[in-house]
Amino acid sequence: MKSQHIKVLIVVVALAAIAIIIPNTNSFVMLLTTRALAFSILVMSLDILLGYTGLPSLGQAAYLGVGAYLTAILATRYQFGLGYDFWLVVVFGILLAAALAAIFGLLAIRATGVYFLMITLALGQCAWGLAYRWNSLTGGDNGINLRARPKFGIDLANEVTFFYLVFGLFAVSLLLMYTLVRSPFGRSLAGIRERELRMKILGYNTWLHKYIAFIIAGGFGGLAGVLWAHTAGIVSPENVVLTTSVDALLMAVLGGAGTLVGGAIGAFIVFGLREYLSTLVPWWQYALGAVYVLTILYLPTGLMGIPERIRQRRVVPGNREDVKKMAPVTS
């Protein structure tokens, strides 16, 4: 069996285990897992840019904010999205976030490296400023409270039912993103990440490829925002702040950039560590920061890169003749 097939099988088994085990735990664990699943979609969307296209973005929280605020505003002001029309809100959230990414991308994709990073940072801060200052629409610093979850044949106020909804959309998102990165388009993105000049010489429109990837990542970020609004029950400028984008970036690096699943693993670990460490010490942020630093220093390929590092360090003993053949010839 090919290694890629084994990895897919492991992911499927892990997802099945989550779907079976989590609903049988307490409500706190279920809520924490649901939040991690929703945020994982944002992290995986960022990984399309970071791991597969080589574009580290600090503005991904803007798309989460678009989806979340759209959901909250429609639900509280117009009672829209609380029935079967919830699925329309999902579509609207994806499209609006993708549209915002299309606008941002016209500016950001023209830059590379640290300049791209700074432009996405600036655009993300603009989104935060709107959320913080536009009190009449966003509620300003107080945010918007969602008092009810949708009902469309099933009651999403039930934590188990809501968990399965978020889990299902997470699984679909993972499948779609996996299909994308394994497609010819996704392989072109990997080529652009490694040798953009060579891809240009081969006739690829590298700007367009990166622009499309930027828009797709924004759309999935909007989906994460729609789910996050109902998961958290409140939408505020905290969802759009810089630290949200940084968290997503660090989660992707912790799990392993360019793996998709690694981003989800990173999100689960960070959400779990936050809750656990915050009950032990008041300076839990520093402990979490130490985890990030150690990961970057000693696991630059993230947790998903551990098996490969083990394989590379494994020494297969050979006979003396093999060693002699490998030894350099000296005069």
Task: Annotate each PLM feature.
Residues 1-331:
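Transmembrane alpha-helices and adjacent helix-loop boundaries
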